[in-house]
Amino acid sequence: MNTTIKEAKQYIGQEVTIGAWLTNKRSSGKIAFLQLRDGTGFIQGVVAKAEVDEEIFQKAKEITQESSLYVTGVISEDNRSDIGYEMQVKSIEVISEAHDYPITPKNHGTEFLMDHRHLWLRSKKQHAVMKIRNEIIRATYEFFNDNGFTKIDPPILTASAPEGTSELFHTKYFDQDAFLSQSGQLYMEAAAMAHGRVFSFGPTFRAEKSKTRRHLIEFWMIEPEMAFCEHAQSLEVQEQYVTHVVKSVLNHCKLELKALDRDTSKLEKVTTPFPRITYADAVIFLKEQGFDDIEWGEDFGAPHETAIANHYDLPVFITNYPTKIKPFYMQPNPENEDTVLCADLIAPEGYGEIIGGSERINDLELLEERLSQFELDAESYSYYLDLRRYGSVPHSGFGLGLERTVAWLSGVEHVRETAPFPRLLNRLYP
C-alpha cells in the first residue's frame, strides 16, 4: 500500500510503501537508521541486518544524502519519535541517486546557504518555516471569509503609488511609465466602496536600499479595507485577526514549532485586547528609558520599537503618529490635528512592526489639500479622488507583512528565511 509519512500513522502494524528522500543516516553495525522526508513529514526508517537481505542492508548503508527512494516496511509505534511512529524497513528501491549533495549535515555560512536556497528549502527547519507560513495564509483566508470579507486582487503594475515618499521600481508599460506595486491599498479602497469589506493578498515591491534583518525587497501583504469603519473598529479587527492567526499556528504547527525550538510561552499569551500607547506617550517612555536619540516628530527605529514591545511583552499598538511622518491619505486626529488616526502594531521579541493601518481621509477637499502638501500630482490620483466625490463614507484599512509575521511566529532571526526565494538588496538569484 502506498502512503505518505503523515498518513502512515493510520497503518500501525501494516506494511506500506513511502516515496521519500534521504535526509541523513547513521549506522551502529547491525542496524541502519534512515531519516526520511516526503514533504508531508519526517520519519525514521530502521533497517535491521538480521531481518533483511544482505543486499538491502548494504544499500541502506551506502545510500547518499538526498537520494530519492521507495521504501517499504511495517509502521510501528515509537513513543520516542516526535510523530509517535517509525518504519521497520523491509526493502529499498533507489529512484535517483544524489551525488555530492552540497548542503551536508555540518554547519554552513549564510551566503552559501542562500546561494543554494533551492536546496536549503529541503532542510527540516526551513521546511517548518514554510509550513508555518502556509498556516498563516490558510488562517488568514479563514478569518476574512468567516467575517464577511470579499477577496479582491489589485494590480501589480500601477501608474501611481500610495506611499508617496517610498522608492519605487520603475518600468515601461508600452509608451507609459509604470511602477511595481508597493501596496494595493488605493485599489482596495475602491473595492470597499463596492463590497463593504474586502481583503487582498499578494506581492509588493519596495526599492529600499536596506540590509536589516526585517527588510525584503519583495514581500507579501494582507491588506483589508472596510467601509463604514472608524479607526477604533479597525484596531479591534486587527487584534482579532492576529490572535486568530497565532492560535491557528499554535494548534496546527506543533511539530514545526518544535523543530524550530520555538518557545511558545509568549505566543500562548497573545489575546485581545492588545495594549495601546500613543506616539506621544511612547516618546516620553523612551526618554525615560534613556533614549536620547528620539524627539517628537521623528519616526521610531528598530531599537525604539523593541524597547516599547519588550515593556509590554505582547503585540502593542502605537497610535496617533505625527501627520508629517505618515502618508497623505490618513484621517486627522480630531483631538490633535498634528497627528493622524493611525496605528502600527509592534510584535514582541524584537520583530518590529507587522501591521500599519489607519482611518482614511473621506473628505474630498482635505484629500486634495494633502496631495498638494505632499507634492503629489492630483491627476495621477483622479480615480482615488472620485471615491470622495461619489458617496464617500468613513473607512479604514491596514496591511500586515506576511514575512515579518512568519519570522515572529516561527522565531527565526532574519526575514530571508521566511520567503521561499527571498529578494534582498544584493540577491536576485536563485
Swiss-Prot record:
Pfam families tied to this protein: tRNA-synt_2, tRNA_anti-codon
Family annotation (SUPFAM superfamilies): Class II aaRS and biotin synthetases (SSF55681), Nucleic acid-binding proteins (SSF50249)
Example of a GO MF term: nucleic acid binding
Gene3D superfamilies per the UniProt record, alphabetical: Bira Bifunctional Protein, Domain 2, Nucleic acid-binding proteins
Reaction equations catalysed: tRNA(Asn) + L-asparagine + ATP = L-asparaginyl-tRNA(Asn) + AMP + diphosphate + H(+)
PROSITE patterns: AA_TRNA_LIGASE_II
Keywords of this entry: Aminoacyl-tRNA synthetase, ATP-binding, Cytoplasm, Ligase, Nucleotide-binding, Protein biosynthesis
GO CC field: cytoplasm
Enzyme Commission designation: 6.1.1.22
Superkingdom to which the source organism belongs: Bacteria
Main localization (coarse): cytoplasm
GO-annotated biological processes: asparaginyl-tRNA aminoacylation
Compartments where found: Cytoplasm
HAMAP family referenced in this protein's UniProt entry, alphabetically: Asn_tRNA_synth
Subunit structure: Homodimer.
Family (UniProt): Belongs to the class-II aminoacyl-tRNA synthetase family.
Protein name per Swiss-Prot or TrEMBL: Asparagine--tRNA ligase
Organism: Staphylococcus saprophyticus subsp. saprophyticus (strain ATCC 15305 / DSM 20229 / NCIMB 8711 / NCTC 7292 / S-41)
